[in-house]
Regions:
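General structural signal for secondary-structure boundaries
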Residues: 1-2, 137
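Catalytic core of non-heme Fe(II) oxygenases with the double-stranded beta-helix
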Residues: 67-155
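Non-heme Fe(II)-dependent double-stranded beta-helix
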Residues: 2-69
Length: 155
């Protein structure tokens, strides 16, 4: 597998983050605000800029057919590739007992591929339409962060 050839270049880290991927607390917000609820993150990344030119992931990412397929499935057009040269098609790596907690990605949507089946865990959870432009829906986000599973779906 491509990643195994570069495993020594994976940057591993542990942090406490909120659902918005921030690691710093904002004491100007109320104590029960979702941005003040922190969870442990223990994972690593192989950034896109270190991939070889013949990378399988890079090849897949650059295919117009994949972009058109996603656009057709979602009914969204146009869809643009992320221009960030470090993160546009990075590998997210977890060791046993690693975790990437429930969070919002920094893009309107993200396409994730599970490259290797985990021995345990690895369940992808999401909450469809929990927020929308102009409405962060903080009350519902807080419920999910507090353990309410009514809106949570699994893949």
């Amino acid at each position: 597998m491509e990643l195994e050839k570069q495993i020594q270049e994976v940057y591993m880290s542990k942090k406490s983050i909120n659902a918005y991927l921030y690691s710093k607390d904002d004491p100007t917000l109320s104590k029960d605000h979702p941005k003040r609820i922190f969870m442990d993150r223990d994972n690593g990344y192989l950034n896109s800029d270190v991939f070889p030119k013949n990378s399988e992931m890079k090849f897949l990412y650059e295919q117009d057919e994949l972009l058109n397929f996603i656009s057709s499935c979602l009914g969204v057009s146009p869809i643009y590739r992320w221009a960030d040269p470090l993160a546009c098609h990075a590998y997210n790596v977890m060791k046993p007992d690693g975790v990437l907690p429930w969070h919002f990605d920094s893009c309107e949507f993200t396409l994730s591929f599970m490259i290797q089946k985990p021995e345990k865990g690895g369940i992808f959870e999401y909450c469809p339409d929990i927020r929308e432009p102009g409405n962060e829906n903080l009350k519902e986000v807080k419920k999910v962060l507090d353990g309410d599973r009514k809106k949570v779906r699994e893949l």
